[in-house]
From Swiss-Prot:
Residues 66-85, 290-321 are annotated as: Disordered. This is Low affinity immunoglobulin epsilon Fc receptor. It comes from Homo sapiens (Human). There are two kinds of Fc receptors for IgE, which differ in both structure and function: high affinity receptors on basophils and mast cells and low affinity receptors on lymphocytes and monocytes. Sequence repeats lie at residues 69-89, 90-110, 111-131. Homotrimer. Interacts (via C-type lectin domain) with IGHE (via CH3 region); this interaction regulates IgE homeostasis. Interacts (via the C-terminus) with CR2/CD21 (via Sushi domain 1 and 2). The gene is FCER2.
């Protein structure tokens, strides 16, 4: 083999080796460039991230500062509200205490007022009772004086049988039988206007006379319950010495029927004073006239005229209260 050929064969591996080295160098340069680029990118990313973090930190710091201020302000407001709430609670407690005090005072005043009203009512009731008793006593005294005067006149020969027109005489008393719808008190006023009073009945004979002449539908009479002692008293102040109650009567002590009517049968029945009846009976003492001189019998009253034998009638027995 020739020498030239041997040199070419030897040169061939050397060329290949140089070509590989060049490729390795180029690869290293490319790799270095890539790493440099990557590092640059990392540095840029780090710088950008650092800036962002700084901005976030600054923003967070500002937010924290603002939040702290807000918290401080809120805490101050909260403390002020708490103080105000405490003050309001104290004022509310004071108001409640004042309300309770006023309530106690109001209750005490109510008790005192009720006591005063009860005392006033008791005083008025007592005064009314005393006034009624005094009025009844005065009326009874007047009645007694009138009866005594009549007894004296009768003993002196006076004739006591004169009655006003439309009045009927019976045993030295005059009776008026009124007609018209009235309550008990208005019937009493009607009798007062005629200088009389609602009738008081003291004997069976008087009761028979009234039963004969009174209305058959019922009439008011002068008996009533004043609620002083739970007993009935005549309007002239006299007590009940004769009674003619219907069976089961009276019932006013429990039902408030404080006035008395006379039924058509003559029996008595207690009734509500505001009940309206169509009749009532008044009475008054008859007027006495002096005795007529002998021979003037015509001037004497009808009960004083001589009988067919020429004798004067015996005077009626005196009335007793």
């Amino acid at each position: 083999m020739e020498e030239g050929q041997y040199s070419e064969i030897e040169e061939l591996p050397r060329r290949r080796c140089c070509r590989r080295g060049t490729q390795i160098v180029l690869l290293g340069l490319v790799t270095a460039a890539l790493w440099a680029g990557l590092l640059t990118l990392l540095l840029l990313w780090h710088w950008d991230t650092t800036q962002s973090l700084k901005q976030l930190e600054e923003r967070a710091a500002r937010n924290v500062s603002q939040v702290s201020k807000n918290l401080e302000s809120h805490h101050g407001d909260q403390m002020a509200q708490k103080s105000q709430s405490t003050q309001i609670s104290q004022e509310l407690e004071e108001l409640r205490a004042e309300q309770q005090r006023l309530k106690s005072q109001d209750l005490e005043l109510s008790w005192n007022l009720n006591g005063l009203q009860a005392d006033l009512s008791s005083f008025k009731s007592q005064e009314l009772n005393e006034r009624n008793e005094a009025s009844d006593l005065l009326e009874r005294l007047r009645e007694e004086v009138t009866k005594l005067r009549m007894e004296l006149q009768v003993s002196s020969g006076f004739v006591c049988n004169t009655c006003p027109e439309k009045w009927i005489n019976f045993q030295r008393k005059c009776y008026y039988f009124g007609k018209g719808t009235k309550q008990w008190v208005h019937a009493r006023y009607a009798c007062d206007d005629m200088e009389g009073q609602l009738v008081s009945i003291h004997s069976p004979e008087e009761q028979d006379f009234l039963t004969k002449h009174a209305s058959h539908t019922g009439s008011w009479i002068g008996l009533r319950n004043l609620d002083l002692k739970g007993e009935f008293i005549w309007v002239d102040g006299s007590h009940v010495d004769y009674s003619n109650w219907a069976p089961g009567e009276p019932t006013s002590r429990s039902q408030g029927e404080d006035c008395v009517m006379m039924r058509g049968s003559g029996r008595w029945n207690d009734a509500f004073c505001d009940r309206k009846l169509g009749a009532w009976v008044c009475d008054r003492l008859a007027t006495c006239t002096p005795p007529a001189s002998e021979g003037s019998a015509e001037s004497m009253g009808p009960d004083s005229r001589p009988d067919p034998d020429g004798r004067l009638p015996t005077p009626s027995a005196p009335l007793h209260s």
